[in-house]
Amino acid sequence: DMLFDMGFIRDLERIVKLTPPKRQTLLFSATIPAEVQQQAAKWLRNPDAIDITPEAIPIKLINQKIYFVERDVKDQMLIQYLCSTPRGRTMVFVRTRMDADRVGRNLTKVGLTAVSLHGEKAQAKRKRAITDFKSDEPPILVATDVAARGLDISSVSHVINYSVPEFPEIYIHRVGRTGRAGAKGEAITLCCSDERYHLGRIEELVDMKLPTAEWPFEDFPDLPHLEKAYHRKKTGHD
């Protein structure tokens, strides 16, 4: 389903047109929104629908907190949290590849070891970033959702949602990367005013009110000049 957001639907349609009329077609999708249903009606003949029960939502073992913040101080708050919190392997999720690179540079600028991971990164650099993240001294991994899909890393201690995902299922995929194998996990979300709608949809899916908290640290430390986010009227997934 995320291929639609990446602009690959036309490629999929061309591929289907090149397949023989007499064939068996199987369609797999993590979610079945209206767009997927429309394509299924075009590509499949009298299909049997198989709905696999999703894995249990990892709520109990994960300490989740929502912090309501102003957008223009997200980077400062992220840096303060990372510098002030005892943590192990840490993933920071952002919405776009530009955010991944920018946030990674800002973390590096203040002395934190960080690498970015997104779909536009060269394959060799992506492999290196993943290898480094799996090492005994892992950098902070700043990743987009699409780029992080398929990563199987069991010992992530902290997940930080720099941006609230637009699709509630993605939130579960993100926070589910911590708290595995019975371990405790931490997942925090920095939510600004225009992201509260997405937060509400997440709470509907998990059927609970996610706990909110006051920011636990004092005034921001002196930081070097940080790159500001570039705001687009319409954002896409990278």
Question: Model segments located where?
Answer:
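Non-catalytic terminal extensions of ATP-dependent helicases
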Residues: P224-D238
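Conserved helicase RecA-like core
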Residues: D1-E227
